[in-house]
C-alpha cells in the first residue's frame, strides 16, 4: 500500500511522466540487444564507424615485415599498438591499397579455372545482344527454373564427394566415386587445380556452382533456360521487357533440350512396336546424348516433360504427381473425386464409354503458352480463368478444359464420327478422341457452350465464342485474366507404375501420362544424339535404314555367318531386320523372302557356292514371312530416294556395290565398311593355313556344341575338340594339337581331310 502511494506521488509530478515516456529507461535491454550473439545487428552502421577510425583492420604480425611503416606520401600504414585480445596488429585501410599496388604477385593461372562460372558469364554477356525495350503488361508466371548456367548434373551428395576428393583429399571419411561423370570431373579438376593457392573453401564453393543444378521458383515471362534466367533482372520488369539474345549456349541447357527431343523420338517409336515398354527400355539404354548414356542423364536430370517422364517411369524412377492432358500439366489443388464408367452419346449418336470423375475438384493448368485455374463438378465446368500469350493459346486452353470437364454439351457438339488413331493405328481412348476432334475445329463447341452476362471484375474480361474479348458477356463460366497461374512449385516426386503400352499411373491408379500426351513438335537437337538401337534407324529416313542394316550385318558377320548355316530361322527373326521391311514394296515382300530363303538353302546344300557378298546383300530380304512361289528374280526393289531402286541378285548396283580389290562396301554411294570375305571363297586351300595347329577329325559332331568361327578357335585348350565353320558355310570337327612340332604338316593334310570330311 505504501509503495502504491509513493508511486502515485511520483506520478503527480510532471517531470516523472516525461522521463518515463520520453527517455529510454531500460538501457540494459538495448545494450543486450546490440551486444549479445555474434550476429551483427546493424552492419552498415558498424562498417561506417569502424572505417572512420584510423586503424580499423587487424592483420597477422607478419604484415610488419611485408609492408613498410609509411607509404610514399608519408602516411602511417600500421600502428605499433597491438590489438587488444589477440596477437594481431592494427592496420590502416591505406595498407590494403599499398598491398594491392606493391604486394607480391602470385600466379593467376588458377583464377579462370576456379572462377570458371564467372568468366564464362562475362563472355556470354560480352557476346550477347540486347535489343529494344518494350513497355507492355507482363504476364509472368512462377516456374521452377535453373539459375546456374554451365553446371554438370550431379546430385548434392555426388558433388559433395567430388569436392571433398578434389579440395580436401587427405580428410578422413569414406568417399565413393561411382558414376562415370564423378570420376571424369574429379580427375579433370585435380589436374587443373594442382598447386592452387586460392583458399580451399572458396574453391569448394565455386566447384559446387559448377557441379550442382540450382533451381528457384521465379516469376518468368519468356525464356526459361538458364542463360536467360541469369539476366532476368535485365530483361523483364513489371511493365517492360528488353529483348536479349544470349552470347553462347551452356551444356546444361543443351542437355535439357536434347534430352526432350531424344525422349520424344523414343516414345513415339516405342509406341508403334510390338512391345512398347520393352522397346522403350532397350532404346533408352542404348542411346547416348552428347557422349553420355541417356539413362545416366535421366537419373540425374530433373527436367519435367511428358516424354522424359514416361522414360523415367519405365526406369522405375520417381516423377512429379501432376498429370498431363492435351499438352497441359494439371495439378489438383483441392477437392476429390471417384471414377465411374459411363456411356454417353455424341451429337452423331456414336456411343462413347468414358470414365467420369464424380465430385468437386479444382486444378491449375499450366501449358507452354497459356495457364488457367479450373473448378469443376461432376460433368460440369464451374469456372475457368485463363491467361495466355495470344488468342490462339487461350483458345487451346479453353478447348482442353471443356473436354476435361466432360460436360454433355461438349459431347453433343461432336459432328461426324470419332475414329482417330495413334501412330500404331490403334483407336485413341474416348477422351483423346474428343480432344483431337475439337482441336481440329472448335466452332460448334464454342457456339453450343452457352453465354452469360458478367459482372465487372478488375483484371478479368469475358470471351465470346469467336474468341473476341467483351466486358458484358462471356462463354458460360469462362473468363480471361491478365494474371498468369503459377506452375506447381513442389519438387516432390512419387512412385509410379507403367504398363506395357506406356501408360503411367500413380499408386491410386490415376493415369498421369500416356504416349498420346507426347508432343508432336520436332526440333533439332543441340547435342549429338546417337541411337544405337535398330528401332531408331528410321529416324533419318530410308537411306539411313539401308546403310545401318548392312553395317550391322558386317559388324556382326562372324556370328551372323554361323547362324546363317545352323539356325537361319532365328537369324531371319532378328529385330535388326525389322526397319528394312518398310523399304520393300508390300505386295512382293513375301515372294522376295521365299526366293532368297530357297537360294540360301541351295548354297547350304551345294558345296562351293557359299558367297559372302551375296548372303549379306540378300539377307535382309529373307526376314519377311515367306510366300512359297516358283518366282525367280534377277533384281530386288527397295524404296529409297522417293522411288524404287534395284539391288541386283548377282553383281553390283548403285544401291549395293562391293569392290573386290579394296574390300569396301558402298551403299547408295556411302561407305558402309570393310567386308572381309571368307578366305578366297573359290578355293578351299587357304582354310588349311588357318587350321594349322588343328587336326581335322571328320564331319560335324553335334555333341561338341555349336560351330565356332575360325577366329574363336584360338580359345580352345590343347586336345580339346570343337565344330568349326569354314569358308563355304561347311562345318567340320577339329581337335587342337597337343604338340606344336607337327603343325607344319597340317597344311598339307588339312586340305585332303576337309574334302574327305565334307564329302
Swiss-Prot record:
Q: Which GO terms describe its biological process?
A: 7-methylguanosine mRNA capping; cap snatching; DNA-templated transcription; symbiont-mediated suppression of host cytoplasmic pattern recognition receptor signaling pathway via inhibition of MAVS activity; symbiont-mediated suppression of host gene expression; symbiont-mediated suppression of host mRNA transcription via inhibition of RNA polymerase II activity; viral RNA genome replication
Tell me a Gene Ontology molecular-function term this record carries.
Answer: RNA-directed RNA polymerase activity
InterPro entries, alphabetically? Flu_PB2_2nd, Flu_PB2_6th, Flu_PB2_C, Flu_PB2_CAP-bd, Flu_PB2_middle, Flu_PB2_N, INV_PB2, PB2_helical
Q: Where in the cell is it found?
A: Virion; Host nucleus; Host mitochondrion
Site (Mammalian adaptation) residue list? 627
Where is it found, in Gene Ontology cellular component terms?
Answer: host cell mitochondrion; host cell nucleus; virion component
Keyword set for this entry?
Cap snatching, Eukaryotic host gene expression shutoff by virus, Eukaryotic host transcription shutoff by virus, Host gene expression shutoff by virus, Host mitochondrion, Host nucleus, Host-virus interaction, Inhibition of host innate immune response by virus, Inhibition of host MAVS by virus, Inhibition of host RLR pathway by virus, Inhibition of host RNA polymerase II by virus, mRNA capping, mRNA processing, Viral immunoevasion, Viral transcription, Virion
> A Pfam family in this protein?
Flu_PB2_6th
Q: Where is this motif: Nuclear localization signal?
A: 736-739
What this chain does, per the entry, is described as:
Plays an essential role in transcription initiation and cap-stealing mechanism, in which cellular capped pre-mRNAs are used to generate primers for viral transcription. Recognizes and binds the 7-methylguanosine-containing cap of the target pre-RNA which is subsequently cleaved after 10-13 nucleotides by the viral protein PA. Plays a role in the initiation of the viral genome replication and modulates the activity of the ribonucleoprotein (RNP) complex.
- Assembly and interaction partners: Influenza RNA polymerase is composed of three subunits: PB1, PB2 and PA. Interacts (via N-terminus) with PB1 (via C-terminus). Interacts with nucleoprotein NP (via N-terminus). Interacts (via N-terminus) with host MAVS (via N-terminus); this interaction inhibits host innate immune response.
Stated family: Belongs to the influenza viruses PB2 family.
Full protein name: Polymerase basic protein 2
Amino acid at each position: 500500500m505504501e509503495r502504491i502511494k509513493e508511486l502515485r506521488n511520483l506520478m503527480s509530478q510532471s517531470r516523472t511522466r516525461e522521463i518515463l515516456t520520453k527517455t529510454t529507461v531500460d538501457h540494459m535491454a538495448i545494450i543486450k540487444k546490440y551486444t549479445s550473439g555474434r550476429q551483427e545487428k546493424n552492419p552498415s552502421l558498424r562498417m561506417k564507424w569502424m572505417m572512420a577510425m584510423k586503424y580499423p583492420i587487424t592483420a597477422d604480425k607478419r604484415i610488419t615485415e611485408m609492408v613498410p611503416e609509411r607509404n610514399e606520401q608519408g602516411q602511417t600504414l600500421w600502428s605499433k599498438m597491438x590489438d587488444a585480445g589477440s596477437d594481431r596488429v592494427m592496420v590502416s585501410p591505406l595498407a590494403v591499397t599499398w598491398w594491392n599496388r606493391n604486394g607480391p604477385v602470385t600466379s593467376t593461372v588458377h583464377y579462370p579455372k576456379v572462377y570458371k562460372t564467372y568468366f564464362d558469364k562475362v563472355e556470354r554477356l560480352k557476346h550477347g545482344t540486347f535489343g529494344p525495350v518494350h513497355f507492355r503488361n507482363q504476364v509472368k508466371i512462377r516456374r521452377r527454373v535453373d539459375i546456374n548456367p554451365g553446371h554438370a548434373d550431379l546430385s548434392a551428395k555426388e558433388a559433395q564427394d567430388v569436392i571433398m576428393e578434389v579440395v580436401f583429399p587427405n580428410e578422413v571419411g569414406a568417399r565413393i566415386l561411382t558414376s562415370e561423370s564423378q570420376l571424369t570431373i574429379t580427375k579433370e579438376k585435380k589436374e587443373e587445380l594442382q598447386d592452387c593457392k586460392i583458399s580451399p573453401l572458396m574453391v569448394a564453393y565455386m566447384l559446387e556452382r559448377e557441379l550442382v543444378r540450382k533451381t528457384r521458383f521465379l516469376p518468368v515471362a519468356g525464356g526459361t533456360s538458364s542463360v536467360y534466367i541469369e539476366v532476368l533482372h535485365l530483361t523483364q520488369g513489371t511493365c517492360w521487357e528488353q529483348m536479349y539474345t544470349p552470347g553462347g549456349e551452356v551444356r546444361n541447357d543443351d542437355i535439357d533440350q536434347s534430352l526432350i527431343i531424344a525422349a520424344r523420338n523414343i516414345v513415339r517409336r516405342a509406341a508403334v512396336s510390338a512391345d512398347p515398354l520393352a522397346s522403350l527400355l532397350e532404346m533408352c539404354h542404348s542411346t547416348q546424348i552428347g557422349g553420355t548414356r541417356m539413362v545416366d542423364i535421366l537419373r540425374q536430370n530433373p527436367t519435367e516433360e511428358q516424354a522424359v517422364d514416361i522414360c523415367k517411369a519405365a526406369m522405375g524412377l520417381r516423377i512429379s504427381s501432376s498429370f498431363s492432358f492435351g499438352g497441359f500439366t494439371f495439378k489438383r489443388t483441392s477437392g476429390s473425386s471417384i471414377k465411374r464408367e459411363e456411356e454417353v452419346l455424341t451429337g452423331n449418336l456414336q456411343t462413347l464409354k468414358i470414365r467420369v470423375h464424380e465430385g468437386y475438384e479444382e486444378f491449375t493448368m499450366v501449358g507452354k503458352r497459356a495457364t488457367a485455374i479450373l473448378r469443376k463438378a461432376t460433368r460440369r465446368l464451374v469456372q475457368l480463368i485463363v491467361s495466355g500469350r495470344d488468342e490462339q493459346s487461350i483458345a487451346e486452353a479453353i478447348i482442353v478444359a471443356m473436354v476435361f470437364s466432360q460436360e454433355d454439351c461438349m459431347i453433343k457438339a461432336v459432328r461426324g464420327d470419332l475414329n482417330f488413331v495413334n501412330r500404331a493405328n490403334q483407336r485413341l481412348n474416348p477422351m483423346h478422341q474428343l480432344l483431337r476432334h475439337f482441336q481440329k475445329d472448335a466452332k460448334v463447341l464454342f457456339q453450343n457452350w452457352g453465354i452469360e452476362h458478367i459482372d465487372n471484375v478488375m483484371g478479368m474480361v469475358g470471351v465470346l465464342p469467336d474468341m473476341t474479348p467483351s466486358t458484358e458477356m462471356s462463354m458460360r463460366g469462362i473468363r480471361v485474366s491478365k494474371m498468369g497461374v503459377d506452375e506447381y512449385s513442389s519438387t516432390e516426386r512419387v512412385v509410379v507404375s507403367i504398363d506395357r503400352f506406356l501408360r503411367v499411373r500413380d499408386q491410386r491408379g490415376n493415369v498421369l501420362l500416356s504416349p498420346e500426351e507426347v508432343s508432336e513438335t520436332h526440333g533439332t537437337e543441340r547435342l549429338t544424339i546417337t541411337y544405337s538401337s535398330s528401332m531408331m534407324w528410321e529416324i533419318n529416313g530410308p537411306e539411313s535404314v539401308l546403310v545401318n542394316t548392312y553395317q550391322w550385318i558386317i559388324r556382326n558377320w562372324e556370328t551372323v555367318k554361323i547362324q546363317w548355316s545352323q539356325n537361319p530361322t532365328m537369324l531371319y527373326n532378328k529385330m535388326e531386320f525389322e526397319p528394312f521391311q518398310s523399304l520393300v514394296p508390300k505386295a512382293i515382300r513375301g515372294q522376295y523372302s521365299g526366293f532368297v530363303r530357297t537360294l540360301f538353302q541351295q548354297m547350304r546344300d551345294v558345296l562351293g557356292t557359299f558367297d559372302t557378298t551375296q548372303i549379306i546383300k540378300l539377307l535382309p530380304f529373307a526376314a519377311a514371312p515367306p510366300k512359297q512361289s516358283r518366282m525367280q528374280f534377277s533384281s530386288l526393289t527397295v524404296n529409297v530416294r522417293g522411288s524404287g531402286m534395284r539391288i541386283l541378285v548377282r553383281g553390283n548396283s548403285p544401291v549395293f556395290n562391293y569392290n573386290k580389290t579394296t574390300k569396301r562396301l558402298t551403299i547408295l554411294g556411302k561407305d558402309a565398311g570393310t567386308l572381309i570375305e571368307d578366305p578366297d571363297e573359290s578355293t578351299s586351300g587357304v582354310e588349311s593355313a588357318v587350321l594349322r595347329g588343328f587336326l581335322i577329325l571328320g564331319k560335324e559332331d553335334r555333341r561338341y556344341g555349336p560351330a565356332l568361327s575360325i577366329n574363336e578357335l584360338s580359345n580352345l585348350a590343347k586336345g580339346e575338340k570343337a565344330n568349326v565353320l569354314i569358308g563355304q558355310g561347311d562345318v567340320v570337327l577339329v581337335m587342337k594339337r597337343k604338340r606344336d612340332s607337327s603343325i607344319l604338316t597340317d597344311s598339307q593334310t588339312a586340305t585332303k581331310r576337309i574334302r574327305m570330311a565334307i564329302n
